[in-house]
Amino acid sequence: MGKKQKNKSEDSTKDDTDLGALAAEIEGAGAAKEQEPQKGKGKKKKEKKKQDFDENDILRELEELSLEAQGIGADRDAATVKPTENNEEESASKQDKKKKGQKGKKTSFDENDSEELEDKDSKSKKPARPNSEVLLSGSEDADDPNKLSKKGKKAQKSTKKRDGSEEDEDNSKRSKERSRVNSSGESGGESDEFLQSRKGQKKNQKNKSVPTIDSGNEDDDSSFKIKTVAQKKAEKKERERKKREEEKAKLRKVKEKEELEKGRKEQSKQREPQKRPDEEVLVLRGTPDAGAASEEKGDIAATLEDDNEGDKKKKDKKKKKTEKDDKEKEKKKGPSKSTVKAIQEALAKLREEEERQKREEEERIKRLEELEAKRKEEERLEQEKRERKKQKEKERKERLKKEGKLLTKSQREARARAEVTLRHLQAQGVEVPSKDSLPKKRPVYEDKKKKKTPQQLESKEALETVEVSAPVEVVDQGVPEKEETPPSVDAEEDEETEDAGLDDWEAMASDEEREKEGNMIHIEVEENPEEEEEEEEDEDEEDSEDEEDEGDSEGSDGDEEDYKLSDEKDLGKAGDTKPNKDASSDSEYDSDDDRTKEERAYDKAKRRIEKRRLEHGKNVNTEKLRAPIICVLGHVDTGKTKILDKLRHTHVQDGEAGGITQQIGATNVPLEAINEQTKMIKNFDRENVRIPGMLIIDTPGHESFSNLRNRGSSLCDIAILVVDIMHGLEPQTIESINILKSKKCPFIVALNKIDRLYDWKKSPDSDVAVTLKKQKKNTKDEFEERAKAIIVEFAQQGLNAALFYENKDPRTFVSLVPTSAHTGDGMGSLIYLLVELTQTMLSKRLAHCEELRAQVMEVKALPGMGTTIDVILINGRLKEGDTIIVPGVEGPIVTQIRGLLLPPPMKELRVKNQYEKHKEVEAAQGVKILGKDLEKTLAGLPLLVAYKDDEIPVLKDELIHELKQTLNAIKLEEKGVYVQASTLGSLEALLEFLKTSEVPYAGINIGPVHKKDVMKASVMLEHDPQYAVILAFDVRIERDAQEMADSLGVRIFSAEIIYHLFDAFTKYRQDYKKQKQEEFKHIAVFPCKMKILPQYIFNSRDPIVIGVTVEAGQVKQGTPMCVPSKNFVDIGIVTSIEINHKQVDVAKKGQEVCVKIEPIPGESPKMFGRHFEATDILVSKISRQSIDALKDWFRDEMQKSDWQLIVELKKVFEII
């Protein structure tokens, strides 16, 4: 029977392993190759299990031995334990094999297959019930005397079989449990659970094994008493012999019945193809238990019918053999299509599940990243908000500091005391001056306190604490919503008239607020301010209600934040004050209230300005166009001003100093002049001209005036680039092109001076294209050649150019208009082209807009008018009396327009004319503005108009930002010349020249030279007399200033042309330098090193005449010489130098010369051969004074090697 049991267990393990290998084959994995190492692992585990089990059993047996105290009982127990141990070895091997099979399945099957296997396990458990019956039957056999009369061998076999069947049952249970664990898919905790189940099984096994052994002992005791060792060995040999015989018989019968069973099984397969996979799994799962049950039944039958035992065994063997063969065949054939399909579906589901999990994980990570990014963005915004808040608070404090309204605690207390005194005086009947004469400030000591009764104060206490505390809470939470809007300065004007009605408003508000009191938030302040807090909050409420009466509903987040901040500060300040000082708290709050009101007024004005600009931007009228601003640019002497003179019929160029434009000028060309100038153009539609005129700006062409060219081009809508047809593109022309490119300003080119072409015949009353056709062939050829050359030069600058009458695409190609400012040819075509381009291509830019846009061009001092500013009004309108803010050297200047002067039409703005005074001016115009405090105005920056007083600080701040950049350009030095010019533009040009010439400037001014300017310049006489100079450009010098300058020794250089001024100053510097060189000639000692030529000693004493080689430096007449190697002995002064019998002033390095050295007056003459030898080196005797003189006045005559020699000699002479 043991043999049968072994065969069954081997079959079941083989089935398991084969199925696992089959699943691995379907997936394409080589599971079969991995089975051998797995078996090895299983053996190791089996040995380990066996050792554990043996140790436990030995402990148990020792306990039984101590109880029984009989050697026979111990022998019996040992005899019964051995078969159990053998059975355990077999079960352990089965478990290992099953484990291998289940591992293979786990890799191939998914969760769905595991569920199916669990169902089959539950079915296979049912046949395990007969174990209990076997035990019962065993006990019956023990009691029955007939059965006891059987041979001892049979009894021993039956007991062994029973023990083996119990062991098989336990093993089958373990394998089922393991299969459940594996099929559950919990891979993470699989090994832990398996170990725990193993431990539990061992415990159960111990508990079960004890009673079976005892029952076996009882049976043995009832059948016989003692077995010798020889008997046991004989029984064992008999059992082994019988097993071998049975195996041989089995093999024979298997071969006989193989063919017959094949046919039967094939038929059954054909009948039931669908049931085969299930049966296969059932067989695989059920073989251990079913085999155990059948074995037990066979054992019972063997004990009952000993005669028929052999036949039954044969039948059982045949039956099991056939079953085994069938299973092997089925496995060889492989799984059915349905099984393969099920496995493939399971694999597909597994892959889908993995993909789904992967997608979910990616989505989760993406969500987390988005949340993190959102959090960071919120943190950044919060940080920015805090920084803005801090910056705003800082700016507000700075502004109040500048205005003198940021009071310290001591100042507030002093102010409070003064107000208390005033109140007492007023109560005594003394007349106190009204606050109308003082700066605007709301009177705190008047009606408000007198009108309020104690009942009203009590009723307001709850209301105000709630009203003020709630906004504080809102600030803490960072919620921007707030009902009250910031008050404005305008509210102050109507305050006195509204004070009477305010109490009613407050009473109404207090009634409404009492109803809502439950919903409001209240915050307690640490120190409880009593009446001061109420009074302060009353004022806050009145301010807000004043605003509500006015109907001002504008608001922004930033303003609300400031308002909340101010409320919070008010609370804090109220908490700090002492309760017994009513008057001091009132006045203290008054100053705080003024400050917060100003802040609110500032924000309100800012919003108003922005709103106005926005509205003006929307209300642009494209039908009505303003006059285009046209800028004239070009190189020196190309004829810019001459072209304008021809257009205006003026002679501005003749009146200019040296014919050079040194200021920016503006000319208004009216529509009538345009029509007059373009009458010779046939295809010009004069009736449909939409522009009201043109404003032409003339800029200087000289290199020094690049700042003015830049300023002029920044204003213009379209530019005229004047090019001399005889010279092409010149340096300032290219600079102008680059300026226009950077500003993205459209332009047309005037090819001027065509009258210089040989044989040119003028025809100013006809179109220039027609005039060109009338010219001789040689003139036309020359023109075409020069025009093509200029087109090529433009191409080199990256611009396409074409003659205007050949240009089909004005947007891509720059138009070239041939002109002659001298004869007037091409002037009409130039104006026609300007009009056409501006009203078609630039119509949106020229659309009429009410928003003011103006730029300060020049600052000029005029006799009888004071300092005036020339302004280009680009958009909007200016009125007399408007408050304007203009940039100044020391900050923005606020002043009122006292006069608006316009030159007559077709007249230059900068040229002194009979100006026409206007009350109102519309764009676009060149306007001269009269006003106070314009001396320090900076040109090149915008002019702004404040329509209300509260807008002034806002506009000032706007200008400050732009002002910083311009002011950085003008940096004064401690030592330098004093520069004075008529306009800021020319002053900038002069300063630029001084910078390039490395001439420092210590002071600047605009306007005529006065005594104060001479005083400032005379300061330099003490520091550095060479800089005690005034450079006056295009300004008048007062007579008393000139006299003072002569007496103090200050030089004033004056010129109307900037280059003449440069030349005069340069000449002065050179003369001054020569004068100083002559003065320091005897102090300055040039360094030299000479070697004596011993064969050329002409005279050894008084004077020493010797031939020398100049090794380093330079030898000059008057250089004192000494010999360092002979204790620095002074041998005399060089009085004469000769080369080839010719006298020279200087001998340079490398020359061989003859020098005459005369002794120093008053000293004994030195002698060659006694005081110094031919081997000694002669050097010039330098000192600190001589080195300084060289640095200051002889630097140009020194070379780098000379300075190196000075460094060397300084060490020799130990000069610091």
Swiss-Prot record:
It comes from Rattus norvegicus (Rat). Residues 1-604 are annotated as: Disordered. Disulfide bonds: none annotated. SUPFAM superfamilies: Initiation factor IF2/eIF5b, domain 3, P-loop containing nucleoside triphosphate hydrolases, Translation proteins. Residues 698-701 are annotated as: G3. The keyword Glycoprotein does not apply. Residues 752-755 are annotated as: G4. GO terms for cellular component: cytoplasm; synapse. Residues 634-641 are annotated as: G1. The lineage of its organism: Eukaryota, Metazoa, Chordata, Craniata, Vertebrata. GTP binds at residues 636-642, 659-661, 752-753, 755-756, 821-822. Its EC number is 3.6.5.3. Binds 1 monovalent cation per monomer in the active site. Structural cofactor that stabilizes the GTP-bound 'on' state. May also act as a transition state stabilizer of the hydrolysis reaction. Its cofactor is a monovalent cation. Residues 659-663 are annotated as: G2. Residues 19-32 have a biased composition (Low complexity). The modification Phosphothreonine is found at residues 107, 497. This is Eukaryotic translation initiation factor 5B. Residues 110-119, 490-510, 526-562 have a biased composition (Acidic residues). Interacts through its C-terminal domain (CTD) with the CTD of eIF1A (EIF1AX) or with the CTD of EIF5 (mutually exclusive) through a common binding site. Interacts with eIF1A (EIF1AX) from the location of the start codon by the 43S complex until the formation of the 80S complex. Interacts with ANXA5 in a calcium and phospholipid-dependent manner. Keywords: Cytoplasm, GTP-binding, Hydrolase, Initiation factor, Metal-binding, Nucleotide-binding, Phosphoprotein, Protein biosynthesis.
